[in-house]
Structure formats: structure tokens, C-alpha cells
Amino acid sequence: MSYELKICLEPVGFVKTDAVGHEVRDKKVISQIVFREELTEALEGIEEFSHLFILFWLNEISDQGRKTMKVHPRGRSDMPLLGIFATRTPHRPNPIGLTRVKLLNVEGNIITVQGLDAFDGTPVLDMKPFDRWDTAEDFKVPEWWLKLDTERTNKKE
């Protein structure tokens, strides 16, 4: 098996948002995805779903960031040093983002969503509807993840 395979992707659209910096992490942020005109008919029926998965290219990650192999989750030194595949860091060999968003509106080749943690101009690679099969009933996470989740929940309250 050769690991030299090169994959060339063409964005299906681009993110349009006024959010900047850490604001994009706010799950209340409203964004638009402007799809290529010739893909408009591919959106037919998507309005029947409440939530979607958006796959996007993290184009602001540097070449050095793509070489990162270990990180502390959320950049916090009080968290364990882990391999990047055990975290949700954007620094990875193939900087692909994946976010579940709430679909608010579809108009022509533009969809409006809530909760997309991507910057203005981010290339969108694909979109898929979210359904009940995408929820695991018996998942587990490590202790450090539970700590971060508890802190995030307490911060919201």
C-alpha cells in the first residue's frame, strides 16, 4: 500500500460569516455557506433536516501546524500531552474540520446555519444530513475530556 497517494479536492462552497477570532467557537454564531452555483440542485431536500454535518478545510493552519503530532487539549498544560488523533485540535496532517450545525434557511445556493466554527472564506468540502444514526448510545471519553466538558458547561450557566 502506498502512502504517496495525492487527493485533490474542489470546494463545494465557502463560508460567509462576520464572526472573527474566537467568536467562531460560539455555538450561537450564524453563518452562511455559499455553494457553487452549479451545485444548487444538489441542495434539494436538505431543508427537511434540522441539523447537518459540515466538512471544511482548515485553510489557516500553517505547514508547521500540519506537522504537529502531539498537543495538550485546548492548549492547556494541565491536560495530558496526547497524539493529535486523540484530540480535536485543528493542527493535523490533513486539516479537515467537522462540525454539526443547525440548519436555519435554504435559499438558492446559500444555506444559513448556526454553530459553524469556521472563519469567513473557509472552503467547504462536503455536507451531510445529521440523523439519529449519528448518535452513539454507549460512547466513552477519557477523564480529561469530562473535566473540559464540565468546565464548559459551568461556564455557560
PLM feature spans:
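Glycine-rich, low-complexity intrinsically disordered segments
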Residues: 1-100, 104-157
